[in-house]
């Protein structure tokens, strides 16, 4: 999505560490109300619980280094700033939906924290397995500045949390990914880019786009080097650690010998990548190729596919014809094919004219799945199969079943499909499902994989050494009470049997990350490995990293972290050999 500048209210801008001391959200002057949502937070109570937003440490406020402006630019800046102040004042008279209200979206342990330099010799309860040697890193959204208007959880600046483990000891650090937008905002000392989901809706969203383009034309900002936040995915590929969000190119990070994090910069694969890349590229464990998609919400082609050889050489882009720009957050690969979801959550920028969100559920569109050879050169090679009621924000795996002429896809089917982005009366459901695509009849079937269980399973993974091949186990977060995660489930995809690991008490977490053990590469020992989970205790306000044996779900070790770790998104593990080979 495109971005725009935002202006402060009078009285100055505060960075998050300053603003969290005073979070009644004074810039958002709305009447207290109870927001009808699954989170069930009374907004009048949030101002009484200011400690939920207060970090345990403080950060140094960003330095304010204003640009050198000519007379024309100064006049333009004054006029645009005045228009933005008027816009913000107007917005304060209108209620925000829960999906864009920062008092809901970044309350409690969803609120941001400052950076932390390396903290060594952390307390470890239990014993860290000897085979674990490297760095577990996890990405997440962490807004540097207090929102001046709407804000969605996905809008926050990218922050990566790193736990380095060596010889049974652990260290911790967390750092912002220094994206182009964050660097500009930090230099100016205030937010100047918009929130793609929280702010770009309705007439005010159109106004923000106009202000954004005006600032760019006047040279008040540089919007030519990307507007992404790099807050979602992580992948280690071709000796590079990449942080990603689907609104921009990846950003290359580097883990130092001490376990700290550095931003190398926006990475275009040595000039080969010209467009954004989604946050869930697929690394084939056998061929070592990286497969990716890129979607555009404004102009055709709305979707493109490409892949990178193990040494980072990009294939020609294959344009995939779609009738409307579609949100494609994830996809899947098999040994020989790519599975492309063309689903019902689409972008209709014209909806902003009627005061609505441009991210909409199109009930008239029929969802479908595209099966395409990995080495396809023409869109005519794609087999499209209709697949109603199969909206999956994430696909966990897929494989080929030659005996039945089918492609088997494992994903969590969500309904209502757009409930993450738009306010809905229905409660969200995320059902772990098996979708079978018959390549001969060109029909699909879907069934729930759980036996006599009604539980929301979302963020998670399978053994990545088996990606694209038949897998037996999936490790998925138990999203209860939504949107919190009270534990994770180990699901047998063959039998539907589910075993739960619950954090207990007021402890909640996020993605269960599976790290294969010494023998966790083959089909027989697929679950040999360990689960990493960042866990936060909402009663004691402390965070920890739990390491659980994936075979028997027994807790092996708990690493006590020196500061709060907000609930976040996706992670990966960089082993000691990969650390040495980093570029």
Curated annotation (Swiss-Prot):
Alphabetical GO CC annotations of the entry are: chloroplast stroma; chloroplast thylakoid membrane
Q: Which reaction does it catalyse?
A: a 9-cis-epoxycarotenoid + O2 = a 12'-apo-carotenal + 2-cis,4-trans-xanthoxin; 9-cis-violaxanthin + O2 = (3S,5R,6S)-5,6-epoxy-3-hydroxy-5,6-dihydro-12'-apo-beta-caroten-12'-al + 2-cis,4-trans-xanthoxin; 9'-cis-neoxanthin + O2 = (3S,5R,6R)-3,5-dihydroxy-6,7-didehydro-5,6-dihydro-12'-apo-beta-caroten-12'-al + 2-cis,4-trans-xanthoxin
Q: What is the recorded function of this protein according to its Swiss-Prot or TrEMBL entry?
A: Has a 11,12(11',12') 9-cis epoxycarotenoid cleavage activity. Catalyzes the first step of abscisic-acid biosynthesis from carotenoids.
Tissue pattern of expression reads: Very low in all tissues. Expressed at the point of organ attachment and the abscission zones in the plant.
* EC annotation from Swiss-Prot or TrEMBL: 1.13.11.51
**Entry cofactor note text?**
Binds 1 Fe(2+) ion per subunit.
- Which cofactors does this gene product need? Fe(2+)
Its family remark reads: Belongs to the carotenoid oxygenase family.
The protein depicted here goes by the name 9-cis-epoxycarotenoid dioxygenase NCED2, chloroplastic
Q: Where in the cell is it found?
A: Plastid, Chloroplast stroma
Q: What induces it?
A: Low induction by drought stress.
* Claim: Oxidoreductase is one of the keywords in the record: yes
What keywords were assigned to this record? Abscisic acid biosynthesis, Chloroplast, Dioxygenase, Iron, Metal-binding, Oxidoreductase, Plastid, Transit peptide
Name the gene behind this protein.
Answer: NCED2
Q: Which residues make up the binding site for Fe cation? A: 280, 329, 394, 570
- Source taxonomy lineage? Eukaryota, Viridiplantae, Streptophyta, Embryophyta, Tracheophyta
Gene Ontology biological process terms, A to Z: abscisic acid biosynthetic process
Organism field: Arabidopsis thaliana (Mouse-ear cress)
Which Gene Ontology MF annotations are present? 9-cis-epoxycarotenoid dioxygenase activity; metal ion binding
């Amino acid at each position: 999505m495109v971005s725009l500048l935002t202006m402060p209210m009078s009285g100055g801008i505060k960075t998050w560490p300053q603003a969290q001391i005073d979070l009644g959200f004074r810039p958002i002057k709305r009447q207290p109300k109870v927001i009808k949502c699954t989170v069930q937070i009374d907004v009048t109570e949030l101002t009484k619980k200011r400690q939920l937003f207060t970090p345990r440490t403080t950060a140094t406020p960003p330095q304010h280094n204003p640009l050198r402006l000519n007379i024309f630019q100064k006049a333009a800046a004054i006029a645009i700033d005045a228009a933005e102040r008027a816009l913000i004042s107007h917005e304060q008279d209108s209620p925000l939906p829960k999906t864009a209200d920062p008092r809901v979206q970044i309350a409690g342990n969803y609120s941001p924290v400052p950076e932390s330099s390396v903290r060594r010799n952390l307390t470890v309860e239990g014993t860290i397995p000897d085979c674990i040697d490297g760095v577990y890193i996890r990405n997440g959204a962490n807004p540097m500045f207090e929102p001046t208007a709407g804000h969605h959880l996905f809008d926050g600046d990218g922050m990566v949390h790193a736990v380095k483990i060596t010889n049974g000891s652990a260290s911790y650090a967390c750092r912002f990914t220094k994206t182009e937008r964050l660097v500009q905002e930090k230099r100016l000392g205030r937010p100047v880019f918009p929130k793609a989901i929280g702010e770009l809706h309705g007439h005010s969203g159109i106004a923000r786009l106009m202000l954004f383009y005006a600032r760019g034309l006047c040279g008040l900002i540089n919007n030519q080097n990307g507007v992404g936040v790099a807050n979602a995915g992580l992948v280690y590929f071709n000796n590079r650690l990449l942080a990603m969000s689907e609104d921009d190119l990846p950003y290359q990070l580097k883990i130092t010998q001490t376990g700290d994090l550095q931003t190398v910069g926006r990475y275009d694969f040595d000039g080969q990548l010209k467009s954004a890349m989604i946050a869930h590229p697929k690394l084939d464990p056998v061929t070592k190729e990286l497969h990716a998609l890129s979607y555009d919400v404004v102009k055709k082609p709305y979707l493109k596919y490409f892949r990178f050889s193990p040494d980072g050489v990009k294939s020609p882009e294959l344009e995939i014809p779609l009738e409307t720009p579609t949100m494609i957050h994830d996809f899947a690969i098999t040994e020989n094919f790519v599975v492309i979801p063309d689903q019902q959550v689409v972008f209709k920028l014209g909806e902003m004219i009627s005061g609505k969100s441009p991210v909409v559920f199109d009930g008239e569109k029929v969802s479908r799945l595209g099966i395409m050879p990995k080495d396809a050169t023409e869109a005519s090679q794609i087999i499209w199969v209709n697949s109603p009621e199969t909206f999956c924000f994430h696909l966990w795996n897929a494989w080929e079943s030659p005996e039945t002429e089918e492609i088997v896809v494992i994903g969590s089917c969500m309904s209502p499909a757009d409930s993450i982005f738009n306010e809905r009366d229905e409660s969200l459901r995320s059902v772990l499902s098996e979708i079978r695509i018959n390549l001969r009849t060109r029909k699909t079937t879907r069934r729930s994989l759980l036996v006599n269980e009604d539980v929301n399973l979302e963020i998670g993974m399978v053994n990545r050494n088996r990606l694209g091949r038949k897998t037996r186990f999936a490790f998925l977060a138990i999203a209860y009470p939504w949107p919190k995660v009270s534990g994770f489930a180990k699901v047998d995809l063959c039998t539907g049997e589910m075993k739960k690991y619950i954090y207990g008490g007021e402890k909640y977490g996020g993605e269960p990350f599976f790290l294969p053990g010494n023998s966790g590469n083959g089909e027989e020992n697929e679950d040999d490995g360990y689960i990493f989970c960042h866990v936060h205790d909402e009663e004691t306000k402390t965070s920890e990293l739990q390491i659980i044996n994936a075979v028997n779900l027994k807790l092996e070790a708990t690493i006590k972290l020196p500061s709060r770790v907000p609930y976040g998104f996706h992670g990966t593990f960089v082993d000691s050999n990969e650390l040495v080979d980093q570029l």
